[in-house]
Curated annotation (Swiss-Prot):
Gene3D superfamilies: UbiA prenyltransferase
Protein name from the UniProt record: 4-hydroxybenzoate octaprenyltransferase
NCBIfam families in the record: ubiA_proteo
Catalytic activity from the UniProt record: all-trans-octaprenyl diphosphate + 4-hydroxybenzoate = 4-hydroxy-3-(all-trans-octaprenyl)benzoate + diphosphate
Residue stretches spanning the membrane: 22-42, 45-65, 98-118, 143-163, 213-233, 238-255, 266-286
Compartmental location: Cell inner membrane
Organism name: Histophilus somni (strain 2336)
Length: 286
């Protein structure tokens, strides 16, 4: 079977999660928040296109390296047992080359930006590479994911104003808290399997306090987003829409109350609407 056979291409697409765009959206929203907040207006179409394509490529690369790192684990977990590397539809060598190609394409995009952003992109690649391996060594892999998913924020500021003001880092912390919250919801789905095979996560670390800590992280997210709006001198419409966005967190807390797998997964998916609503708040506020 050649590497370009139909079955192989389908397997590569599944490695990149082309059939599951939620991760791309969760990475895209904070990137858009940052681009519009840094400019206080719509960014140039070229910068916007570079970041949108970059988000797609780097999220895809992250999924590929994640499956490579978990290739001996995924087959033991119900939700991931049919992934391409677990079933042999793609080989580890093919996954490594796919990761390299995706990162290389991302780097070509970054070369269209300023040197400031090119320098920041190196950290993005490092974070994307090390995150999947953290679940073997620490119960805090979600924090590494938060840093990886949030690094597009300083890159967005660097690409537009070549500076990293306080509001950039407040936005980064807001996104970090949000990411840890929703990825803990995601980890709650696999908690029983992870305990059995020895994989670490915040869902395991937080134990019976998981819902309370998720709620605390969501409150921190909102506080920092309100702070960003204040420092950026956004108008009142931003704060009104942001308050509406907070209602999604209330709904998610209700979903995860009984820790049912399907409900926890639905709570995770619901974060797409939170990210979208915050973006709408930014558009109304600038």
């Amino acid at each position: 079977m050649t590497i370009f056979a139909k079955d192989k291409l389908i397997a590569y697409g599944q490695l990149m999660r082309l059939d599951k765009p939620i991760g791309t959206l969760l990475l895209l929203w904070p990137t858009l928040w940052a681009l519009y907040l840094a400019e206080k207006a719509m960014p140039t179409l070229s910068v916007l296109a570079i970041f949108i394509f970059g988000v797609f490529l780097m999220r895809s690369a992250g999924c590929v390296i994640n499956d490579y790192a978990d290739r001996h684990i995924d087959g033991k977990v119900k939700r991931t047992s049919l992934r391409p590397l677990s079933t042999g539809r793609a080989t580890p060598r093919e996954a490594k080359w796919l990761f390299i190609v995706l990162v290389f394409c991302s780097f070509l995009l970054v070369l269209c930006l300023n040197l400031y952003t090119i320098g920041l992109s190196v950290i993005a690649v490092i974070l994307a590479f090390i995150y999947p391996f953290m679940k073997r060594y620490t119960h805090l892999p979600q924090f590494f994911l938060g840093a990886a998913f949030g690094w597009s924020i300083p890159m967005a500021y660097g690409a537009t104003i070549e500076a990293l003001p306080l509001e950039c880092w407040l936005l980064f912390i807001a996104n970090l808290s949000w990411t840890v919250a929703y990825d803990t919801q995601y980890a709650m789905v696999d908690r029983d399997d992870d305990l059995r095979i020895g994989v670490k996560s915040t869902a395991i670390l937080f134990a019976q306090y998981d819902n309370k800590i998720i709620a605390l992280l969501q409150i921190i997210t909102l506080i920092f987003l309100f702070s960003v709006g204040y420092l950026s001198q956004l108008n009142n419409r931003y704060f009104i829409v942001l308050a509406i966005a907070g209602l999604f967190f209330v709904y998610q807390c209700r979903l995860t109350k009984n820790r049912d797998r399907e409900s926890c997964f639905n709570a995770f998916l619901n974060n797409n609407y939170f990210g979208l609503t915050v973006f709408i708040a930014v558009l109304f506020g600038i």
